[in-house]
């Protein structure tokens, strides 16, 4: 083998290795799910149609709990528009409440959300037209609690999802979201996507160039998704970030607090 051919071969092999290291076929977010039951939290299955409502949650994420908080804890106003019938129970959308003697009991689980690399767009995508990760789990283990159907179609329609993570800012990252349910997203603890209320499919895009971030720094990325109504559950997320996780809890959840171990890990 001549030197030129050997050089070409080595260059090809090195580029292949570097490419594969830089762009793994999949990346996995270990997320926290909270199974909800409308009989315990009446903010679920309010039996209404509505529209997108912005301004339901505070524009700055609570740095201690790392979950959204309502702007108002009173009935009426935006809470009525967003079909938050009991504001005091909103805190348990994305936090565990496993005491059956108290209101808003839920079932926390951990779940792996696997993103697939799209080489044509150089992004990672999670796309699920029927995002029902806890069918016949949680409260729905009991057939008597499968009370909210879409006609004759069964799913466990009532659950919320929380992703607490971080990324190293490279200077041009973006996020695309498509969903027919509530989504709130925060970068650097600031609200960047505000899709509250009971609404139909909506697409949103975050361009991080507009957020005043510094290249090379690590920033928190927190995403909250909640399905409160029957019919469907669509979720598409497209990202092009360098994902990092400062620490994982003993459930394997990034920045978790161990609470999702109560219900176990969903395969």
Swiss-Prot record:
InterPro entries: Fibro_Slime (IPR011874), PA14/GLEYA (IPR037524), PA14_dom (IPR011658), Prespore-cell_inducing_factor (IPR051154). It is found in: Secreted. Residues 1-22 form the signal peptide. Glycans are attached at residues 47, 62, 99. GO terms for cellular component: extracellular region. Disulfide bonds: none annotated. The keyword Lipid metabolism does not apply. Residues 116-257 form the PA14 domain. Keywords: Glycoprotein, Secreted, Signal. Belongs to the prespore-cell-inducing factor family. This is Protein psiS. It comes from Dictyostelium discoideum (Social amoeba). The gene is psiS.
